[in-house]
C-alpha cells in the first residue's frame, strides 16, 4: 500500500463463517485500476484464499465509536444530552469525572457526532473501530471457492485411484 501511495483508512480482521478462515477488511480510497492491481497482488500472497474489492454500494458497513466526555459538562449543558439522543448514541458508563458514550453506525454519523460533541467542549478522548463490512450479495464467495477446490481435489483422487 505504501509503495502505491494508498492510505489505509481502516483495517479490520475477524473470523469468517468458515472455521479457520479469517477475513481482512481493508478500507482505502483510490481509483479502480489501482485497487484491481492491489487486489491481484494480495491474491498472490501465501495463505490468501481470495481477495476481492467492493464499492460502498456493494457492502453493508458499520463502525463503533467510544467518546469519553467530561461528566460535569454533560450534567451542566443539556445540549450535550440532546446531541447524544439526536444520534441514537448511548451512555454506557458514568462516574464523577467522565462518562463514556457508545455509537454504532455509519462513518459519517460517527464523525458528525464527534464534531458536535467537540464543539460543545466536552470530549476527553475518542476512538473508533474502522469499518466492519459484509457484502450485500446472497452468497459467500469463499464458500464457493472452497467447494470448487474440494470437488477438484476429489476428482484428482478418483483419477489417481483408477
Regions found by a protein language model. Give the residues of each.
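Long, contiguous binding/interaction regions
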Residues: 2-22, 32-64, 68-162
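Amphipathic, charged alpha-helical scaffolds that flank and support histidine-based chemistry
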Residues: 25-29
Amino acid at each position: 500500500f505504501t509503495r502505491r501511495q494508498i492510505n489505509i483508512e481502516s483495517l479490520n480482521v475477524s473470523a469468517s463463517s468458515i472455521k479457520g478462515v479469517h477475513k481482512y477488511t481493508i478500507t482505502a480510497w483510490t481509483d479502480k485500476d489501482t485497487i484491481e492491481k492491489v487486489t491481484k497482488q494480495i491474491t498472490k500472497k501465501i495463505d490468501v484464499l481470495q481477495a476481492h474489492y467492493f464499492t460502498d454500494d456493494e457492502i453493508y458497513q458499520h463502525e463503533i465509536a467510544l467518546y469519553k466526555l467530561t461528566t460535569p459538562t454533560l450534567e451542566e449543558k443539556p445540549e450535550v444530552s440532546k446531541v447524544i439522543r439526536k444520534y441514537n448514541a448511548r451512555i454506557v458508563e458514568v462516574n464523577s469525572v467522565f462518562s463514556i458514550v457508545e455509537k454504532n453506525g455509519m462513518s459519517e454519523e460517527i464523525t458528525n457526532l464527534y464534531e458536535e460533541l467537540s464543539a460543545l467542549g466536552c470530549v476527553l478522548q475518542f476512538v473508533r473501530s474502522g469499518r466492519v463490512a459484509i457484502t450485500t450479495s446472497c452468497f459467500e464467495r469463499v464458500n464457493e471457492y472452497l467447494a470448487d477446490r474440494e470437488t477438484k481435489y476429489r476428482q484428482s483422487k478418483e483419477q489417481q485411484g483408477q
